[in-house]
Curated annotation (Swiss-Prot):
HAMAP family noted in UniProt: RNApol_bact_RpoC (MF_01322)
Listed EC numbers: 2.7.7.6
CDD domains: RNAP_beta'_C, RNAP_beta'_N
Gene from which the chain derives: rpoC
Cofactor note: Binds 1 Mg(2+) ion per subunit. Binds 2 Zn(2+) ions per subunit.
Protein known as: DNA-directed RNA polymerase subunit beta'
GO terms, molecular function: DNA binding; DNA-directed RNA polymerase activity; magnesium ion binding; zinc ion binding
Entries under Pfam families matching the protein: RNA_pol_Rpb1_1 (PF04997), RNA_pol_Rpb1_2 (PF00623), RNA_pol_Rpb1_3 (PF04983), RNA_pol_Rpb1_4 (PF05000), RNA_pol_Rpb1_5 (PF04998)
C-alpha cells in the first residue's frame, strides 16, 4: 500500500486504452457471476478468481495450494495466484469492446467537451453517436464538406454519385477518427488569431473552445481518449454479491450494468463474425453504446435502466454523488471503532472536566487495555483467558478498569455538531446504570438537555491523540465561545435561581445591623439562626486582607448581606469583593458608600440605604469572563464548579416553589378588553361605510389588540412582588420572561394564522382562568406554525453551514506576519439612529495597522502593530476616537490562508492565534451555528407605500453569501458628483435622478414606489445609494472595488445577525467575504499565456504577471469578481474538495480533461485521502519537530539512551559486522 502521508499532491486525468489494459489483471469475457450450485465464481466471469484473486486467504480455487507458505505461486490446475483475499478489493479487470464507445460524461456534459473540440453542436454529435446520421470524415474532391451530417438516404445517394471518393461513418468510431485528426496546436493558434478580431457570440464560442483545447494541450491528454476501446471492470469486492437468509442473492447494481455491457458486446462480436447486415450491426452497436452509458451514468441520457420494482439502477456516477455517495458517506464520514452511544443524564456531583461512563460501556470500550493489564499483573495467563474473564465480568476486573481509565480522557459528541464545542474531552468516571452522565455546565456548548438526548463517546487511542485531547479538548479549557469570545459556560436554571436568591437583600430580616469581625463569625451566627442569607450586616474589611479595598477604608466596616458574603467566598482570595452586580465592581473595589463613617450608626445607615440588587444570570456570565481574563483556565474551572455547587445547594434549601396562588390576578382586565372591543367596533363601522380599506381595517384591529395586551402586561409588571417565586425566576434569568407571565396572569393576545398573518380574534383568557374551546383551537395554529418553522429553519441553516465550511475549509493561519502595509478603517456600524455594532466590539482582539491618536491632545494612545485588548479598546473609545485602521483578513497577503497579525486574537482563548489554527472552519461554524436563531420571515411593510419589502434573518444572510440579486434592490450612483435634479415622469410612473459628475452626467430611472434616499444638491460618491434598499454586491464591485464590497458584505451580515440579538465577531465574516472575492476574471491576457475570460486566483494572477514584467513583457489585466459561496467552493483549486461538495460529475469531468493536480492544501482533500490534515499539530512546522531530551552530564554516563541513540548504535554495529564479513 502507498503511504498517504508521503505524497505531496494528487493528479487526475483521462485514461488511455493502454492505461486501462495495464491496470487490468485479465479480460472479463462472460456475463456470469457465480455458479448457483457450488457458489464458486465462474471462469472468465465478473468474479473470476484468476483475474481478481482468490476468495479465500492464501488458497487457490481448487485447493491444491493452501497456506501462506505458497504465497505468490500460481496454481497450475486452476490458474489462481495464492495470495491474500484482500487483493479482490484492488485488482481490476477489463472488457475489450467490439466497437469504440463514447464516454457519456464528455459528450453529454454541459458544455459538451467533444462538441467543443470538434466544433460540432451537441445535437449533431448525438445523432452521429447513436447511429441516426452519418458524418463526413474525409470529403475528398467531392462537393461535400468535412464534418457534414448526412441522413441514411443522403448517404446512399452520395455513395451512388461519388463512390469511394469520400468517406463518411457513424457511431463513436466516426467521432474517434475525427478526434484523432484534430491538430491541437494548430487549432489553438487559429483560435488565438480569431480572438483578436472576433466579437459577440463568435468570441464567446472561440474562448470556450480555446479553453478546452488549451487544457488538452497542457495536460497531455489526447482528445481521442474520450472514446473508449475497452472499459475497466472495478474490483469485485467493491461490487459484492452476498447470500441472504433465504438462499437468495443480493448484488450491487453495477453487476447488472456490467452484465448488460458484456452480453451486448459478445452479441456484437458474434454478429461481426457472421458478417451480419449493416443495419443489425449498427443497432447492436447503438445498444452497446447505451449499455456503457448506463454503466457510467444511468439516467443521464434517455430513460434510466431499471431493476426490479422499477427502481433506477445505481451506476458508477451515482456511487460518487450525493450524501450517500462514496465521497460524503465513506471518505468524509467514516464510522470509527472504540465508540459507543447512550442516553445522557445530568450529574451535578461531577467536576467540570469529568463525565460519567456506565460500567458496562467503559468495560467494552477499554477492553484491550484491561486485557493487557490483566496479563501484565498475572491475573490471567494469556489474552484469551483475560477476554474470558471480562466476558464473565469477574470481580477483579473492576479495579483494573478504574486504573486503566485514569489519565485517559474520552471524547463526547452530540449531534448535530454545529460548532467545534460539539466534541469535547472529559475524564471518565465509572457510574452505575446505562446512561452517560454529563456536567450541567457543559450542556450549553452541546445545546443538550436531558429529555432523551443521546451522545456518542470515543476513545482516543494513540499517545498523541490522548495528549491532544487532554491539552486542547478538555472541557475545562472551553470556557469562551469561538464566535464572540464571551463565556459559553453560562450557569442556567437552578444554578442561576440559587445564586440570585442567595444574593437578595430584605429589609428587617432577623439580625439586621449585626456587625461581624470575620466571615467565620457570621457563619456561626447563621448556623445558630441569628441571621438569614438576606440579612444586611456589617463586616470588617480587614478580615479579608488579601482583597483590594478603597484607599483609606482597609480597616473600615462595610455593609453587605450574609448571602453575598457566602457568594464571595467562591471567588479567588485576592479578587475584589462583589457587592454590586456591575462591571465596575468586577474591576474596582467595593464602592465607598457601603462603608460606615467613623461614629455612624449602622441601623440609621441601613434605613436610608437602597436595597442592593441580587446577581442575575448576565452578571454571573460577566464574572466568569472577568475571572477567565485575570486567572485563566484552571482557576476559572474551579470557580465554575464552586458556583454550580453553591447554586444547587442554595436552590434546594431555599424552598422556592410555584403554586397557582403565586400567579397574581388583575382586577380591571375585563374593562381593558371591553374598551378594546369598542374600538374594534368603531373600526368595523368605518370599514362598512367605505372610509377605510380592508387592509387598513385589519392592521388597525391588530394594533388595537396588541395595544390592549401591552396595557395588561404593564399592569402585571406593576404588581410584581420581589418575593414572588415566579418573579424571581423571570427576573434572575433562570426561566421564563414577562411575556410568559402575561399569558399566565393577563391574556394570551393575538395568535398566528396558518397563512402567516395574524388572526383578528384575540385569546382574551389567560392560563390561570383557562381557555375556552375556541380559544384553545385558535392557539393550536400558532403552536403548529412554530414547530414547522423550526424544522424548516434547521434544514436551511444546516445547508448554509455546509456551504460556508466548504468554501473556507482551507483557510488556515499559515504564517506569523504577511508584511502587508494595507489595513481596514473601521467605525461603528449603525442603521439610522440605531447602533448595530459599536466600535469597541470591532477593535477587541485586533492588531492596529496605524497608530491611534487622541483627537484632542494628538498623543499616541495605541502605537501601530499592537494587539488591542479590552482595556486598550476602552481607552481608544473613551478618548472619542471614531475610526481606527486595523489589520484585517481582507487585506492579508498570505497565500491559501491568513497570517497571525491580520487575524488577531483567537477568541476562544483570549490569546494570540497560533500558526496552524483552522480559522476558516471556525468562522464557518461561528456563522452557521446561530443560523437556527435567525428568523425565516421576510418582513413585509404592511402595505405602507414607499418602503420596499426588506429581507431579514436567514434569507438575507443567504442572499448576501450567495451574492444573489437582493430583493428590494437599491439603485446606486456610478459617478461621484452632485444630484442636480429629481424629476417625476407621470407617463412612465418613474422618477428621474440626475447625477452630475466631474467628467460625465448620469440619469437614473427609478420606480415611483422606491423611496429616494437623496435630495437635490446632495453630494454622492460612486457606489452610494440613490434609493433605499439593499445594494447588489455585483454592481458595487463593478462601480467601486473589492474592499468596498467586502466592507458592505461585512456590515450587512452583522446587521442581519445583531438585529436578532446574535453577536458574531467581525473576523469570522471577513474570512468568508474574502473567500468570495478570491478570484479575478482576465480581461486582456497581455503577453501572458492566460486565456481571456478565465477565472483565476488573485495570488496566481499576480505571480504570472510578475514573471512577464520581469522578462519585460506586457502584463495581463483583470477585474475583481464576486462569487457566491457555492460557486466559490466549486471553483477552488482542489478538485477533490469541489467534487465532494456538489456537482461531482461536472467537477471530475473538467478536472480530468485539464489533468488537474490537487496540491492537498485544504482539510477536506486530506481527509478524503486519509492523510493527516495540514492544520494544528498536522502543520509541517509541527510534524518536523523532534522532542529533545535534556539530560545532565552525569546522567548521560549511566547509559540512558533515547530510541534514536539506540537505533544509531545498532546501525553502527551492523555496519561493523558487514565490514568484518566483507574482509
Amino acid at each position: 500500500m502507498i503511504d498517504v502521508n508521503k505524497f505531496e499532491s494528487m493528479q487526475i486525468g483521462l485514461a488511455s486504452p493502454n492505461k486501462i489494459r495495464s491496470w487490468s489483471y485479465g479480460e472479463v469475457k462472460k456475463p456470469e457471476t457465480i455458479n448457483y450450485r457450488t457458489l464458486k465464481p465462474e471462469k472468465d466471469g465478473l468474479f473470476d478468481e484468476r483475474i481478481f484473486g482468490p476468495t479465500k486467504d492464501w488458497s487457490c480455487a481448487c485447493g491444491k495450494y493452501k497456506g501462506i507458505r505458497y504465497r505468490g505461486i500460481v496454481c497450475d490446475r486452476c490458474g489462481v495466484e495464492v495470495t491474500s483475499a484482500k487483493v479482490r478489493r484492488e485488482r481490476m479487470g477489463h472488457i475489450e469492446l467490439a466497437a469504440p464507445v463514447s464516454h457519456i460524461w464528455y459528450f453529454k456534459g454541459i458544455p459538451s467537451r467533444m462538441g467543443l473540440v470538434l466544433d460540432i453542436s451537441p445535437r449533431a454529435l448525438e445523432e452521429v453517436i447513436y447511429f441516426a446520421a452519418y458524418i463526413v470524415i474525409d470529403a475528398g474532391d467531392t462537393d461535400l464538406e468535412d464534418k457534414q451530417l448526412l441522413t441514411e438516404a443522403e448517404y446512399r445517394e452520395k455513395k451512388a454519385k461519388f463512390g469511394n471518393r469520400f468517406e463518411a461513418k457513424m457511431g463513436a468510431e466516426a467521432v474517434k477518427e475525427l478526434l484523432e485528426q484534430v491538430d491541437i496546436d494548430k487549432e489553438v493558434h487559429d483560435l488565438k488569431e480569431e480572438l483578436k478580431t472576433a466579437t459577440g457570440q463568435k468570441r464567446t464560442r472561440a474562448i470556450r473552445r480555446l479553453d478546452i483545447l488549451d487544457a488538452f494541450k497542457n495536460s497531455g491528454n489526447k482528445p481521442s481518449w474520450m472514446v473508449m476501446d475497452c472499459i475497466p471492470v472495478i474490483p469485485p469486492d467493491l461490487r459484492p454479491m452476498v447470500q441472504l437468509d433465504g438462499g437468495r442473492f443480493a448484488t450491487s447494481d453495477l453487476n447488472d450494468l456490467y452484465r448488460r455491457v458484456i452480453n451486448r458486446n459478445n452479441r456484437l462480436k458474434r454478429l461481426l463474425d457472421l458478417n451480419a447486415p449493416r443495419i443489425i450491426v449498427q443497432n447492436e452497436k447503438r445498444m452497446l453504446q447505451e449499455a456503457v452509458d448506463a454503466l457510467i451514468d444511468n439516467g443521464r441520457r434517455g430513460r434510466p435502466v431499471v431493476g426490479p420494482g422499477n427502481r433506477p439502477l445505481k451506476s458508477l456516477s451515482h456511487m460518487l454523488k450525493g450524501k450517500q455517495g462514496r465521497f460524503r458517506q465513506n471518505l468524509l464520514g467514516k464510522r470509527v471503532d472504540y465508540s459507543g452511544r447512550s442516553v445522557i443524564d445530568v450529574s451535578p456531583k461531577l467536576k467540570f472536566y469529568q463525565c460519567g461512563v456506565p460500567r458496562p460501556m467503559a468495560l467494552e470500550l477499554f477492553k484491550p487495555f484491561v486485557m493487557h493489564e490483566l496479563v501484565k499483573r498475572g491475573l490471567a495467563s494469556n489474552i484469551k483467558n483475560a477476554k474470558r474473564k471480562i466476558d464473565r465480568e469477574d470481580d477483579d476486573i473492576w479495579d483494573i478498569l478504574e486504573d486503566v481509565i485514569k489519565e485517559r480522557p474520552v471524547l463526547l459528541n452530540r449531534a448535530p455538531t454545529l460548532h467545534r464545542l460539539g466534541i469535547q474531552a472529559f475524564e471518565p468516571v465509572l457510574v452505575p446504570g446505562k446512561s452517560i452522565r454529563l456536567h450541567p455546565l457543559a450542556c450549553e456548548a452541546y445545546n443538550a438537555d436531558f429529555d432523551g438526548d443521546q451522545m456518542a463517546i470515543h476513545v482516543p487511542l494513540s499517545d498523541e491523540a490522548v495528549a491532544e485531547s487532554r491539552l486542547l479538548m478538555l472541557a475545562a479549557h472551553h470556557i469562551l465561545a469561538p464566535k464572540d469570545g464571551k463565556p459559553i459556560v453560562t450557569p442556567s436554571q437552578d444554578i442561576v435561581l440559587g445564586n440570585y436568591w442567595l444574593t437578595q437583600a430584605e429589609r428587617g430580616r432577623e439580625g439586621e445591623g449585626m456587625i461581624f469581625d470575620s466571615p467565620a463569625e457570621a457563619a456561626i451566627a447563621y448556623a445558630n439562626g441569628d441571621i438569614h442569607y438576606h440579612t444586611r450586616i456589617g463586616l470588617a474589611a480587614d478580615s479579608m486582607p488579601e482583597k483590594p479595598w478603597p484607599k483609606g477604608y482597609e480597616h473600615g466596616i462595610f455593609v453587605t448581606t450574609y448571602g453575598k458574603l457566602v457568594f464571595n467566598q467562591i471567588f479567588p482570595k485576592d479578587f475584589f469583593y462583589i457587592n454590586d452586580p456591575t462591571q465596575e465592581n468586577l474591576t474596582h473595589p467595593v464602592d465607598e458608600r457601603y462603608f460606615l463613617q467613623p461614629g455612624e450608626d449602622i441601623h440609621e445607615k441601613l434605613d436610608n440605604m437602597k436595597l442592593g440588587k441580587a446577581f442575575k444570570k448576565g452578571f454571573l456570565s460577566d464574572s466568569i469572563a472577568q475571572i477567565y481574563k485575570d486567572y485563566k483556565v484552571q482557576r476559572t474551572s474551579d470557580f465554575l464548579d464552586d458556583l454550580k455547587e453553591l447554586g444547587y445547594t442554595v436552590c434546594t434549601t431555599s424552598g422556592l416553589t410555584i403554586g397557582v396562588e403565586d400567579i397574581p390576578t388583575i382586577t380591571d382586565k375585563d374593562d381593558i378588553v371591553a374598551e378594546a372591543r369598542k374600538k374594534v367596533d368603531v373600526v368595523s363601522k368605518q370599514y362598512r361605510r367605505g372610509l377605510i380599506t380592508d387592509e387598513e381595517r385589519h392592521d388597525r384591529v391588530i394594533s388595537i389588540w396588541n395595544n390592549c395586551k401591552d396595557i395588561v402586561q404593564n399592569e402585571i409588571a406593576q404588581i410584581h412582588a420581589p418575593r414572588n417565586p415566579i418573579t424571581i425566576m423571570a427576573d434572575s434569568g433562570a426561566r421564563g420572561n414577562i411575556s410568559n407571565f402575561t399569558q399566565l396572569a393577563g391574556m394570551r393576545g393575538l395568535m398566528a394564522a396558518p397563512n402567516g398573518g395574524m388572526m383578528e380574534i384575540p385569546v382574551t383568557s389567560n392560563f390561570r382562568e383557562g381557555l375556552s374551546v375556541l380559544e384553545m383551537f385558535m392557539s393550536t395554529h400558532g403552536a403548529r406554525k412554530g414547530m414547522t418553522d423550526t424544522a424548516l429553519k434547521t434544514a436551511n441553516s444546516g445547508y448554509l453551514t455546509r456551504r460556508l465550511v466548504d468554501v473556507a475549509q482551507d483557510v488556515i493561519i499559515r504564517e506569523e506576519d504577511c508584511g502587508t502595509d494595507r489595513g481596514l478603517t473601521v467605525h461603528a456600524i449603525t442603521e439610522g439612529d440605531e447602533m448595530i455594532e459599536p466600535l469597541f466590539d470591532r477593535l477587541v482582539g485586533r492588531y492596529t495597522s496605524k497608530s491611534v491618536y487622541d483627537p484632542e491632545t494628538h498623543e499616541v494612545i495605541c502605537p501601530a502593530d499592537v494587539l488591542m485588548d479590552e482595556d486598550m479598546a476602552h481607552k481608544i473609545v473613551d478618548a472619542g476616537v471614531t475610526e481606527v485602521t486595523i489589520r484585517s483578513v481582507f487585506t492579508c497577503n498570505t497565500q491559501h490562508g491568513v497570517c497571525k497579525k491580520c487575524y488577531g486574537m483567537n477568541l476562544a482563548t483570549g490569546d494570540d492565534v497560533e500558526v496552524g489554527e483552522a480559522v476558516g472552519t471556525v468562522a464557518a461554524q461561528s456563522i452557521g451555528e446561530p443560523g437556527t436563531q435567525l428568523t425565516m420571515r421576510n418582513f413585509h411593510n404592511g402595505g405602507v407605500a414607499g418602503a420596499a419589502d426588506i429581507t431579514q434573518g436567514l434569507p438575507r444572510v443567504q442572499e448576501l453569501f450567495e451574492a444573489r440579486n437582493p430583493k428590494g434592490r437599491a439603485t446606486i450612483s456610478e459617478v461621484t458628483g452632485e444630484i442636480t435634479s429629481i424629476e417625476e415622469d407621470p407617463a412612465e410612473h418613474t422618477r428621474q435622478i440626475t447625477v452630475k459628475g466631474q467628467t460625465d452626467t448620469r440619469t437614473y430611472d427609478v420606480p415611483y414606489t422606491a423611496s429616494v434616499a437623496v435630495a437635490e444638491g446632495d453630494h454622492v460618491v460612486r457606489g452610494d445609494k440613490l434609493t433605499l434598499g439593499s445594494i447588489d454586491p455585483k454592481e458595487l464591485i463593478r462601480v467601486r472595488d473589492a474592499l468596498t464590497t467586502e466592507k458592505y458584505i461585512l456590515s450587512e451580515i452583522q446587521k442581519a445577525y445583531r438585529m436578532q440579538g446574535v453577536e458574531i465577531a467581525d473576523k469570522h465574516v471577513e474570512v468568508m467575504a474574502r473567500q468570495m472575492l478570491q478570484k479575478v476574471r482576465i480581461l486582456d491576457p497581455g503577453e501572458t499565456d492566460i486565456l481571456p475570460g478565465e477565472l483565476m486566483d488573485i495570488g496566481e494572477f499576480k505571480a504570472r504577471n510578475r514573471e512577464v514584467i520581469i522578462s519585460g513583457g506586457i502584463p495581463a489585466t483583470a477585474q475583481s469578481v464576486i462569487l457566491g459561496i457555492t460557486k466559490a467552493a466549486l471553483e477552488t483549486n482542489s478538485f477533490l474538495s469541489a467534487a465532494s461538495f456538489q456537482e461531482t460529475t461536472r467537477v471530475l469531468t473538467d478536472a480530468s480533461i485539464r489533468g488537474k493536480n490537487d496540491p492537498l492544501l485544504g482539510l477536506k482533500e486530506n481527509v478524503i485521502i486519509g492523510k493527516i490534515i495540514p492544520a494544528g499539530t498536522g502543520m509541517p512546522v509541527y510534524r518536523e519537530m523532534e522532542p529533545k531530551v535534556d539530560v545532565p552530564e552525569d546522567e548521560k554516563k549511566k547509559s540512558v539512551y533515547s530510541i534514536a541513540d539506540i537505533e544509531k548504535k545498532l546501525a553502527a554495529a551492523d555496519a561493523e559486522k558487514d565490514k568484518g564479513s566483507a574482509d
